[in-house]
Amino acid sequence: MTRSLKKNPFVANNLLKKINKLNTKEEKEIIITWSRASTIIPIMVGHTIAIHNGKEHLPIYITDRMVGHKLGEFAPTLNFRGHAKSDNRSRR
């Protein structure tokens, strides 16, 4: 179920403060965040945000096509290594 249109998109307050501070200074630096649930809003476009994936922070450059999506969608948490090879010893 999607979020109600009456409510605004969720963005963590500390992340919003960091972005507003960088926009007023007109500087570009990497913003580190653990807030994977935050929605990407238009003022974030052009910034690089390092999103935590459970192990490390992955730097993601925000473009205009990402607006409306969540930050966590761009930092995968699982590393699929493939299925086990057909091992006949395990089937006996």
From Swiss-Prot:
Cell location: Plastid, Chloroplast
GO biological-process terms attached to the record: ribosomal small subunit assembly; translation
Any GO CC annotation of this UniProt entry: chloroplast
InterPro entries: Ribosomal_uS19 (IPR002222), Ribosomal_uS19_bac-type (IPR005732), Ribosomal_uS19_CS (IPR020934), Ribosomal_uS19_SF (IPR023575)
Top-level taxon of the source organism: Eukaryota
Pfam families per the UniProt record, alphabetical: Ribosomal_S19 (PF00203)
Keyword terms: Chloroplast, Plastid, Ribonucleoprotein, Ribosomal protein, RNA-binding, rRNA-binding
UniProt key word Ribonucleoprotein: yes
UniProt GO MF annotations: rRNA binding; structural constituent of ribosome
Function: Protein S19 forms a complex with S13 that binds strongly to the 16S ribosomal RNA.
Similarity section: Belongs to the universal ribosomal protein uS19 family.
Full protein name: Small ribosomal subunit protein uS19c
Organism of origin: Guizotia abyssinica
